[in-house]
């Protein structure tokens, strides 16, 4: 009987242990592997992946190189681009420094970033461009959709799920990614005094975000949504994730004026020019942000403050034409596939920029304006074989005339 038992015993093809010495043995095509060897294999793969990620980060571009990359895609905002280049370089240098030295008594803090600037000034695009240039996973979240645990809405952990998905569920890569949280000003407390009642979309969300921003091992539901008992969770350490948060902070310039001892512009007085408003934005300090409604602990985890300026007509015209993937170049490429040249008059470009400013959409509104102007042209051109050139005039932008079509 004993001999029969040995003949029926299954052994791991890798470590030689039998089925009684381990918890489980998985059968394959003529081979067997035990749970212990599976766990060891996973650990080896995890370590090798982490080494590959660190090797990639060791080649992080220097601040000047990052600035050159940003300049290829982003027009203006020179102060902000320099600040971001330094902060991002220091962040990944910190990761390399921490990982490469064991008994190190110097604790380098994260360089998380707070960007303040009007709608359409380039906050999201700057963050996207940085992540793309570094080849790291990137996720965007809207703070207004977040609620603290226990309320209807999105848990803050779901932000981390977006990053994990962007990293193709490679946790090591995700743990060194970048998360951009937009509309952060919309979760400001209403006033400086702490509310007695629970603040679902204000301080409570700030407290929840604070934990993952400062660094914690978070449990993330793999399918998103709310956490449920007995649900298997993904564990992710956020200590090396770079958080960039942004918002318009409408009205914060009045708080700055009060602090500086100047009267707030009221009825019967002329509004300040954009240049004056921009100068106030440059004076923003942590005290002003706290008065606006962000809690001190949250502000303290965002040491790098970058304020973006309102884009002018000249800035928007440059955005339309200069960057590597400028909108004008994109539409010229589209029409070139139909064998047609596309040209914008200078005053047409200025009219497009002026419309974006009037609509208070900034750079993000430029594409929709061009679409309005180009819609009929893009509909007709593929069927008009004799057209060789399309010229967009100011009158076409203003809706007073059709674009000029030139034929062979």
Curated annotation (Swiss-Prot):
GO cellular component, one term: HslUV protease complex
SUPFAM superfamilies on file: Glucocorticoid receptor-like (DNA-binding domain), P-loop containing nucleoside triphosphate hydrolases
Domain ClpX-type ZB: 1-53
Official protein name in the record: ATP-dependent Clp protease ATP-binding subunit ClpX
Molecular function via GO: ATP binding; ATP hydrolysis activity; ATP-dependent protein folding chaperone; protein dimerization activity; unfolded protein binding; zinc ion binding
Alphabetical list of SMART domains matching this protein: AAA, ClpB_D2-small, zf-C4_ClpX
Binding site for Zn(2+): 12, 15, 34, 37
PROSITE patterns according to UniProt: CLPX_ZB
Paired cysteines (S-S): none
Family per similarity comment: Belongs to the ClpX chaperone family.
InterPro entries registered for this protein in UniProt: AAA+_ATPase (IPR003593), ATP-dep_Clp_protease_ClpX (IPR050052), ATPase_AAA_core (IPR003959), Clp_ATPase_C (IPR019489), Clp_protease_ATP-bd_su_ClpX (IPR004487), ClpX_bact (IPR046425), P-loop_NTPase (IPR027417), Znf_CppX_C4 (IPR010603)
Organism: Streptococcus thermophilus (strain ATCC BAA-250 / LMG 18311)
Subunit record text: Component of the ClpX-ClpP complex. Forms a hexameric ring that, in the presence of ATP, binds to fourteen ClpP subunits assembled into a disk-like structure with a central cavity, resembling the structure of eukaryotic proteasomes.
Pfam families: AAA_2, ClpB_D2-small, zf-C4_ClpX
């Amino acid at each position: 009987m004993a001999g029969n038992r040995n003949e029926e015993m299954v052994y791991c093809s890798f470590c030689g242990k039998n089925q009684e010495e381990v918890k489980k043995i998985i059968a394959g095509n003529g081979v067997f592997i035990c749970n212990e060897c599976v766990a060891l294999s996973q650990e080896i793969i995890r370590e090798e992946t982490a080494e590959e990620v660190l090797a990639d980060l060791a080649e992080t571009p220097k601040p000047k190189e990052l600035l050159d990359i940003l300049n290829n895609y982003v027009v203006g905002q020179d102060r902000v681009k320099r600040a971001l280049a330094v902060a991002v370089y220091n962040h990944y240098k910190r990761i390399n420094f921490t990982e490469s030295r064991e008994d190190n008594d110097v604790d380098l803090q994260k360089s998380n970033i707070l960007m303040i600037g009007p709608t359409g000034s380039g906050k999201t695009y700057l963050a996207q461009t940085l992540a793309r240039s570094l080849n790291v996973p990137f996720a965007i979240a809207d703070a207004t959709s977040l609620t603290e645990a226990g309320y209807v809405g999105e848990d803050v952990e779901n932000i981390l799920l977006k990053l994990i998905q962007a990293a193709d569920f490679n946790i090591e890569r995700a743990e060194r990614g970048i998360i951009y949280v937009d509309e952060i000003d919309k979760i400001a407390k209403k006033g400086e005094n702490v509310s007695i009642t629970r603040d679902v979309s204000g301080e409570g969300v700030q407290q929840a975000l604070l934990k993952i921003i400062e660094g914690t091992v978070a449990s993330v539901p793999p399918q998103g949504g709310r956490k449920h008992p007995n649900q298997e969770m993904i564990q992710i350490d956020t200590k090396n994730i770079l958080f960039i948060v942004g918002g318009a902070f409408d009205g914060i310039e009045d708080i700055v004026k009060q602090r500086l001892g100047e009267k707030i512009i009221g009825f019967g007085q002329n509004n300040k020019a954009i240049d004056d408003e921009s100068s106030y934005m440059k004076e923003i300090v942590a005290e002003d942000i706290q008065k606006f409604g962000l809690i001190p602990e949250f502000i303290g985890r965002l040491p790098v403050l970058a304020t973006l300026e309102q884009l002018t007509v000249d800035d928007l015209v440059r955005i339309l034409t200069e960057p590597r993937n400028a909108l004008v170049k994109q539409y010229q490429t589209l029409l070139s596939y139909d064998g047609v040249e596309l040209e914008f008059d200078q005053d047409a470009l200025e009219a497009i920029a002026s419309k974006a400013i009037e609509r208070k959409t900034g750079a993000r509104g430029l594409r929709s304006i061009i679409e309005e102007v180009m819609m009929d042209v893009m509909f007709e051109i593929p069927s008009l074989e004799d057209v060789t050139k399309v010229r967009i005039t100011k009158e076409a932008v203003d809706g007073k005339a059709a674009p000029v079509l030139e034929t062979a």
